[in-house]
Amino acid sequence: MKLKKALITAAATLLLFGAAVEASAETPQGEPMTKKILQTAGRDVLGKMAPDFARYNDDILFGEVWNKQDALSVKQRSMITVVSLVSQGITDSSLKYHIQNAKNNGVTLEEMADTITQVAFYAGWPKAWAAFRLVKEVYEIQ
């Protein structure tokens, strides 16, 4: 379990070092896919030490999973990622990054607040409080 959390935290932390986005077309449902995720952080940070992990991070997680254009939009994927991190109790800089990413992908403050309120009942009240502190920073709420 600790290894799993460490790997998830490492993957999320890698995001802090170089996820880039570019404009894209639309989903199969005709909704705009606002961004395409491009990632080199895995190779930049861990390329020589853990080349397989770096490749999975850059090519699979970001190259395929985040860019999959089917039923989920990038906005929805961002919200799911925030919920996943909060539910695991990961409330460090990786969660802050993903809250910022969600905001950049169109998640409003109201949507973020409702999402964290919902997950609080299943993941725990203290985790939600910790997440809300980061939401206030990202959305610049006093």
Across the structure, where does each feature detected by a protein language model lie?
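Bacterial N-terminal signal peptides that target proteins for export
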Residues: M1-A10
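Acidic, glycine/proline-rich low-complexity segments that act as flexible tails and inter-domain linkers
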Residues: T9-L16, V21-K75, N104, A128-Q142
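Short acidic alpha-helix initiation/capping motifs at coil-to-helix transition points
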Residues: R55-D59, G89-L95
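Aromatic- and histidine-enriched alpha-helix N-cap/loop-to-helix transition segments
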Residues: V74-S78, E110, A123
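Short alpha-helix boundary/capping elements
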Residues: S84-T91, A123-G124
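Extended intrinsically disordered, low-complexity coil regions enriched in Ser, Thr, Gly, Ala
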Residues: T91-A113, A128-Y139
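Substrate/cofactor-recognition hotspot
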Residues: Q118-A120, G124-W129
